[in-house]
Amino acid sequence: MAHTSKTVIVTGGSQGIGSGAVQAFLDRDYNVVATSRNVTKSKDLPSSRKLALVDGDIGEATTAARVAETAISTFGSIDALVNNAGIFFTKPFTDYTAEDFKRLVSTNLDGFIYMTQLAIKQMLGQKSGGSIVSITASLADNPIAGVNASIPMITKGGINAITRSLAIEYAKDGIRVNAVAPGVVDTPMHTNSPKDFLKRLSPMGSISNVHEIVDAVIYLTEAPHVTGEVLHVDGGAHIGKW
């Protein structure tokens, strides 16, 4: 087990990939601040003196401010950020509404911007570098016929793009910025989806599990010479038609 006094923020930390990441970081002796709308009610998170929980909508700037302040006041630093909070739903393009778009932008983009700005400002002040890892989606690189997610992919593709831009902007400050792009992952988001259908969305004919995504997050958080990378964990779905 790695031993560290570093502090990581995990958004969308109450279940699925988020709660898996929280546990993995705790196992590696990180201090963790986890946030989601109702993270204090999560049954997937352990009780730990190294874990602080902050309820709130990450699409609101005040939530991001409270999360950053909790990290600094409780643990003294922000050394890593995992932008995991996100929403996703499919519709034909012409059925998406203006309200759908606002919801997607609020959580997927506004939340990313608010939290990442505060994390980078703190990292710059600490002068010890840092890591930012965001969860995007394989679909942003390779759409799949029958999975109508054009509007959500505006947000996920945007995060892929800003990941590369920020990696260049802050490279000399030692702040690394990367992303993990999953395909279908066995999380509560897909509880009611037919597993046979989901398996067909990958050339390997299988569904990723949370631990596989979390392993990628941990790798990118700790890899000292990797930045600007969008790491696909999708059974090959980003490659193209199969």
Q: In which residue ranges do the predicted regions lie?
A:
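Active-site loop of short-chain dehydrogenase/reductase
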Residues: 5-6, 77-78, 123-137, 172-175, ...
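Conserved glycine-rich cofactor-binding loop
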Residues: 14-15
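Conserved NAD(P)H cofactor-binding loop of Rossmann-fold oxidoreductase domains
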Residues: 84-89, 236
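Substrate-binding pocket helix/loop in short-chain dehydrogenase/reductase
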Residues: 92-93, 100-105, 198
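Active-site helix of classical SDR
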Residues: 116, 155, 163
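Alpha-helical segment proximal to the catalytic Tyr-Lys
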Residues: 121, 164, 168-172
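C-terminal substrate-recognition "lid" of short-chain dehydrogenase/reductases
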Residues: 175, 209-233, 238
